[in-house]
Amino acid sequence: MKNLYKYIFAAMLTLTTATSCSDFLDESPKGVIDEDKAFSRPDEMVTSAYAMLGDCWYSYPFNLWPYGDLSSDDCLKGGSGTTDTGYHPMEIWSTMTSTSGEFDELWYRLYCAVSRCNRALLSLEQYGNTKLGEETCKQRIAEVKFLRAHFYFKLSTMIRQVPWIDENVVKNKLQEQTRNDEFTYEQLFDKIIADFKEAYDVLPEVQKDKNRANKIAAASYLAKCYLTLAYGDGYEATNGYDHINKEYMQKVVEYTNVVKNSPNYGYLEDYGDIFLPEEKNSKESIFAVQTSDYKNDNTTFGRANWSNVLNGVWGMWSCGWDFHKPSQDLVSAFKTKNGLPEFDDYNKTIDYPVNGKPNAQTWDPRLFHTVGMPTFPYKYEPEYTLTKANSRTPNTYGYYCSMKEVPQRSKGETYNGSWHAFAMNDYVIRYTDVMLMRAEALIETDNLAEARSIINDIRQRAKNSVDKHIAYAENQCDIALYPESYFQNKETARKCLRWERRLELAMENGRYFDLRRWGIASKTLNAYFANEQKDVYDGQTYATYLKDAHYTAGKNEFYPIPYNQLYYVPGLYKQNKNY
């Protein structure tokens, strides 16, 4: 694992410059290292492709938090106000346009990553067998195809119709002839699936370098692809559930079964441990973007998580800019009655816990691992108790803050540079996410009993996650397992599954994509906009700007193709519908 870190840093210092992005359609190494010399070292070209996993910045976060969380009912933008960064349209939708600089930069950087993968594949094709040996070369090709599929999954789930540019397109110099509508949505996913399938067929379950892609990561991603496709073309359906593809759901069951049966992955015993840096490569982590602390990795600066650099607590960190703020709607979703969610009544009253002052309202324990709240210790450390002063603009974004992506304050900042950041891995896929995908597919393939068993296993872990980290909230927590009566029909089982995904994966950057997959984004978000702007915390109103928010079905399911990309290749790309 240390060797892979070493090569990634070398790739950053050399190949990042050598293959700087001049144009995502035709990226060529130049500058620090001679092109032929760099290209003739296939294993380092592979490492340079891995380096792109973390080659992000707050204006183009590869974990997609502005596009998967901010755009949902789980969080508000945060910062100094609505004009702080260009992410405000993502939280109100009504002002979404193709001219966003953030859209354009993210598209550009993701295609730089695709280009890096294509360059590595061409290097492996030419030099791999002779320099690495046939078996190692075969594995490296599979790893790079996994990485390329990973980047394309992000592009296609965000923007839908994107140009497919692989190593053959590059080799034949067809980049400037490649349209974005050459393939349908499903055909594009077929290509992504083919890359993941090659990784699944070739790679071992365990790699010598722990951070490389492996068979289980590929199986997890294949399940995610088929789950996405099972619901149709990505736009909201109007015919109930008849459109759900049972064959694809069965594929989800099959691939998640591979993950379930692996002895190398499983649930961590305490939910809170998942989000501590010392557990970042635990059995819960199937694939993650790796980071490191400069004090421990023998580098000058370290490898920081730049996607989340804005999300620290105001007044607690030098990089605490107070972005990614949990919504009241999310906090209310953690309410319980007799240990079970208040599905229909959770948002009827505005409630929030106060440390040391329990009342009749009880909460799922995962709230206290997910949302930082005034009067409570921040991430389990009483010496760093949150106050109202730790919110930057409470009259706009309220008093809650996110906890999962930020380390405990006592750990300090872990990037040695003019900007400060954290060495917290970004989960791409974690074990519980895969098991919830499995439960979702089991419900749709009529195995409600096993789905209930999976969900109850996850709830049992949450029930057991009080004493170690959040004993101060013990008398405010209550969570129970679902009785059989909740899984007698698909309608109620779906409600339990969807609620569980929200609570378990809250603030992990995927809520919007769940809502879209289920075809309930417009109904859920427009109701949320109406309710959230009325919320009050201890007399303070906030989020009144949501009066201007509106989500339009048939348009907003996908983000627009950036205007600059349409301009650069006139007539080659078609805009998503209704933009």
Spans of features found by a protein language model:
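Short coil/turn linking the two alpha-helices of tandem helical-hairpin repeats
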Residues: S156-T157, P163, Q207, T228-A237, ...
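Conserved, well-structured interaction surfaces
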Residues: F39, M45-D55, G81-I159, Q175-D190, ...
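Membrane-proximal, proline-rich intrinsically disordered regions
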Residues: C21-S71, P562-Y579
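Bacterial Sec-dependent N-terminal signal peptides
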Residues: M1-K30
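Glycine-rich, aromatic-lined ligand/substrate-binding cores of catalytic
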Residues: K283, V289-R392
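Long, intrinsically disordered, low-complexity segments
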Residues: P42, C75, L110-A113, Y185, ...
